[in-house]
Amino acid sequence: MVASEPVKRLFEEYEKAFSALDIGRSARFFADTFISAGPNGTITNSKTELLKSASQAADFYRSVGQKSAKILSLDEQPVSEQYSLVKVHWGVTFEKTGKRLTEFDVSYLMQKIGPEPKIILFIAHQDEQKAMQELGLLKD
């Protein structure tokens, strides 16, 4: 992991929350307002909305059989004193795929103002729905 200590600590905790499908706990790492982006577009979110949909999101990942999530690599690139771009290479296991890791990348723009860094933007590099369909995880 190539990252500052505060960012490293944040992602160590975020990894635990994501692996446990504790979306409510994951929400604490996000700014009050943030942007989600991916191959299909962008949306703005609030932490309040994320918390409201937390159980639904966790239920979805359980329904496709997610068993674990692990950060395989993490690289932080400073943008300015207050911001950095963090690229995370994730490995996730599913019931259907056994111990074989499904790997994907997400980039996070971190705001480092205040006592802890916060995620203000995340960009999924791959189409999650398409990848899950290819793995046979989604029902038609």
Residue spans for each PLM region:
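Short beta-strand edge/turn micro-motifs at domain boundaries
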Residues: 103-137
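Hydrophobic/aromatic beta-strand elements that line small-molecule binding cavities or substrate pockets
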Residues: 71-77, 90-92, 105-111
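Short, cysteine-centered beta-strand-loop-beta hairpins and adjacent loop/turn segments enriched
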Residues: 92-102
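Short, low-complexity N-terminal intrinsically disordered segments enriched in polar/charged residues
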Residues: 1-32, 48, 137-140
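Short hydrophobic/aromatic-rich beta-strand segments that constitute the beta-sheet cores
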Residues: 36-37, 86, 119-121
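A solvent-exposed, acidic/Ser-Thr-rich amphipathic alpha-helical stretch
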Residues: 23-76, 82
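Generic short beta-strand segments
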Residues: 33-35, 87-93
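Structural motif
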Residues: 30, 79-80, 96, 113
